[in-house]
Curated annotation (Swiss-Prot):
Keywords: Early protein, Glycoprotein, Host endoplasmic reticulum, Host Golgi apparatus, Host membrane, Host nucleus, Lipoprotein, Membrane, Palmitate, Transmembrane, Transmembrane helix. It is a single-pass type I membrane protein. It comes from Human adenovirus C serotype 2 (HAdV-2). This is Adenovirus death protein. The keyword Transcription regulation does not apply. Glycans are attached at residue 14. Pfam families: Hum_adeno_E3A. May interact with host MAD2L2/MAD2B.
């Protein structure tokens, strides 16, 4: 053993420039972070954000539409001859339970 020193395997100059502070040397992560800016991939992040916003907006609209009661106004015609309520909306007629004085 002659006084040799072991050099560190991590080059901190490469990792601190990208914000990575790991003690391990990960060349694939380093290349990905640097290539993200060099490949002009900034538009992908913005597009992904807009896609998520549109999906969230559609979910909110569908939940509100499902929560509202349906607007339903039946058309009812009273027919005094057979004491039944005739509905013009296609549903079954129901018997009239009112007593006449």
């Amino acid at each position: 053993m002659t006084g040799s020193t072991i050099a560190p395997t991590t080059d901190y100059r490469n990792t601190t420039a990208t914000g990575l502070t790991s003690a391990l040397n990960l060349p694939q992560v380093h290349a990905f972070v640097n290539d993200w800016a060099s490949l002009d991939m900034w538009w992908f992040s913005i597009a992904l954000m807009f896609v998520c916003l549109i999906i969230m907006w559609l979910i909110c609209c569908l939940k509100r539409r499902r929560a509202r009661p349906p607007i339903y106004r039946p058309i009812i015609v009273l027919n005094p001859h057979n004491e039944k309520i005739h509905r013009l909306d296609g549903l079954k007629p129901c018997s009239l339970l009112l007593q006449y004085d």
